[in-house]
Amino acid sequence: MAKVKIQGHASGTGVLTVTAPNTSTDRTITLPDATGTLLNSDGDGSSLTGIETVTKQATAPSSPSEGDQWFNTATSTVSGITTKSMAVYNGTAWKAMSKTGLTATGGTITTSGDYKIHTFTSSGTFAVTVAGTVEYLVIAGGGGGGVANGGGAGGGAGGYRNSTGSETSGGNSSTESTLSLATGNYTVTIGAGGAGNNHGGTSGSKGVQGSSSVFSSITSIGGGYGGGDADKPGGNGGSGGGAARNNTTEGNGTSGQGFNGGDSSGNNDGGGGGGAGASGTNGTTSPYRGGNGGTGLASSITGSSVTRAGGGGGGSESPTDDAGGIGGTGGGGKGGQAGSVGSTPTAGTVNTGSGGGASGDYNTGGSHNGKSGGSGIVIIRYEA
């Protein structure tokens, strides 16, 4: 049986009418602008090879080959491909075949690969001049650490909401849907970190809850305060604050944003604040240690992996060096301890939304104050 091979070049969109050698049926084939072998047909034209097919489904095709095409039917971003859009596999990753078309100003603007990134470390305006779809990372301010004579509690991390590719949001939640933005101005609010409590010379108390960060319809809730002598339970927030000495009521994190704080398990060492990636740990008595802050989460929305939103460490009554809880990865402040050896707690790192470290006692001056949480951040990106 003779084979029909169609070769050549069509400028623009061309139409070839082919009569197979053993049938009177004409086969009409529409060709794009291309050069070389486009497709092969058997003798009667009933079987064609060389035609690219598109897989339409809500998950990325498994075991793809270079050049495979996929249309994302999901209602959210999957493997970095926005909803209702086409992608091609380049041999290592799925890449969007079409751009969002969005253009905007505001914040500090950088580029990474196919993306333009707007980073806001202080409040401002995201001005959209051409409508389109964006991904975002919105982190609130972290909670302040508490003060207690024997172990204040660490502040919780600010709420962590993320729509970047296959990354996660706080509290072990799935990535959120992307945002479709019309032209116009969108206020970006960066939440401040909550203040740590001053010892006051005679009694200690809780820290201050962090402030929320807001972008468009997305609000991340400020981190919960760390408990203190006068107000021992931890505060609720994006991630919860820890409970102060001799108290087991830690603050709760918000679903989809962060984890709970730790408690003091009936001893004189405060619990750690919750982080975006894990709960704060409890204070312990054997040995005497403040609870560690919960770990933060890493995101590559800027093109590089950065961990943010760690919980603050709890304070300890022990004068032993480093008895204060460790701050959670991502910028959580270290907890302090009693006495003068390495006792000073530290603040949450700015623009990470991390919780502040707690004080171990309040009898020896201002260095034993609970420390403030870190301010939040908003990062927005779209295909350039």
Region spans (language model):
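Fibrous stalk/shaft segments of extracellular and virion attachment machinery
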Residues: 2-13, 19-57
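Extracellular/surface-exposed low-complexity repeats and stalk/linker segments enriched in Gly/Pro
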Residues: 2-4, 49-80, 97-98
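A generic structural signal for beta-strand entry/edge sites
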Residues: 3, 13, 26, 83, ...
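Short, ordered beta-strand-loop transition motifs
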Residues: 10-11, 21-25, 65-66, 109-116, ...
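Flexible, charged surface loops at secondary-structure boundaries
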Residues: 23, 62-65, 181-182, 302
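Short hydrophobic/aromatic-rich beta-strand motifs
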Residues: 28-30, 61-88, 116-121, 137, ...
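Repeat-associated, polar segments at repeat-unit boundaries in modular proteins
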Residues: 35-38, 88-96
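Low-complexity, glycine/proline-biased repetitive segments and flexible coils/loops
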Residues: 90-93, 99-384
